[in-house]
Amino acid sequence: MAVKIRLARCGRKKRPFYRMVVADERYARDGRFIEKVGTYNPLVNPAEVVVAKDRVEHWLGQGAQATRTVKSILKKEGVAVS
């Protein structure tokens, strides 16, 4: 089971809001997930990000891979991502 930290789209048409989730890579983008570790709202200026840093670090320590977009968000929030 390859685990990824990625963004799941929520919100409505033309008004995206994202949940940062830990999920098996085989699951659909907006489908099942293991744990919600944060949120990302790109519509406000500056973008609003809420991250449970301890849980993200836990999952990264367990071998989860962050997607490219999530890596850039986490770097801006000060979470060490390899």
Swiss-Prot record:
InterPro entries: Ribosomal_bS16 (IPR000307), Ribosomal_bS16_CS (IPR020592), Ribosomal_bS16_dom_sf (IPR023803). Keywords: Ribonucleoprotein, Ribosomal protein. Gene3D superfamilies: 3.30.1320.10. One of its GO terms (biological process) is translation. GO terms for cellular component: cytoplasm; small ribosomal subunit. Disulfide bonds: none annotated. It comes from the Bacteria. The keyword Transferase does not apply. One of its GO terms (molecular function) is structural constituent of ribosome. HAMAP family: Ribosomal_bS16. Belongs to the bacterial ribosomal protein bS16 family. This is Small ribosomal subunit protein bS16. It comes from Desulfosudis oleivorans (strain DSM 6200 / JCM 39069 / Hxd3). The lineage of its organism: Bacteria, Pseudomonadati, Thermodesulfobacteriota, Desulfobacteria, Desulfobacterales.
